[in-house]
Amino acid sequence: MRIDTSALCDIYSDQVDVVEPIFSSFGGASSFYGKITTVKCFENNGLIAEVLEEEGEGRVLLIDGGGAVRRALIDAELAKLAVDNGWQGIIVYGAVRQLDVLETLDIGIHALAPIPVGAEDADIGEVDTPVNFGGVTFFPEDYVYADLTGIILSPELLDLNELAE
């Protein structure tokens, strides 16, 4: 189902938080939504790989990379792993790389910027902890909705059938 964050904001204005418009879309899917799983790490992606090995149906991986854009936290290999395991999307408060591959994959990917330098492969960081960026605090198990217009957050699953009316 196509997500329209503008319409969701109109319908659920008192229930959603809007993430500051600092992200760009790099994946092949223009919209996505799901329950959040968080990873907090800095310039390393070992924990990201571990989480993406899990079943991702109905889930979005939200990565707090501290806003650093010196090393890419998501590359083609990790994005393909996410697709293979059914993840709906990835949001990176940091950088990504290998855009020519990312844009062909059936997954939504939002990040701050691209850079060709890869991250370290260390398992340093935290999983499923609240993170704050873009003017919003994200809690594990919140729901995130993203399209080319923006990213919104809700503590509860929104009724997407409202979009069809």
UniProtKB/Swiss-Prot annotation:
Keywords: Cytoplasm. The keyword Aminoacyl-tRNA synthetase does not apply. GO terms for molecular function: endoribonuclease inhibitor activity; enzyme binding. Pfam families: RraA-like. It is found in: Cytoplasm. GO terms for biological process: regulation of RNA metabolic process. HAMAP family: RraA (MF_00471). One of its GO terms (cellular component) is cytoplasm. Globally modulates RNA abundance by binding to RNase E (Rne) and regulating its endonucleolytic activity. Can modulate Rne action in a substrate-dependent manner by altering the composition of the degradosome. Modulates RNA-binding and helicase activities of the degradosome. InterPro entries: RraA, RraA/RraA-like, RraA/RraA-like_sf, RraA_gpbac. The keyword Cytoplasm applies. Homotrimer. Binds to both RNA-binding sites in the C-terminal region of Rne and to RhlB. This is Regulator of ribonuclease activity A. NCBIfam families: NOT-MenG, PRK09372.1, RraA_entero. The gene is rraA. It comes from Haemophilus ducreyi (strain 35000HP / ATCC 700724). It comes from the Bacteria. PANTHER family: 4-HYDROXY-4-METHYL-2-OXOGLUTARATE ALDOLASE 3-RELATED (PTHR33254), REGULATOR OF RIBONUCLEASE ACTIVITY A (PTHR33254:SF29). Belongs to the RraA family.
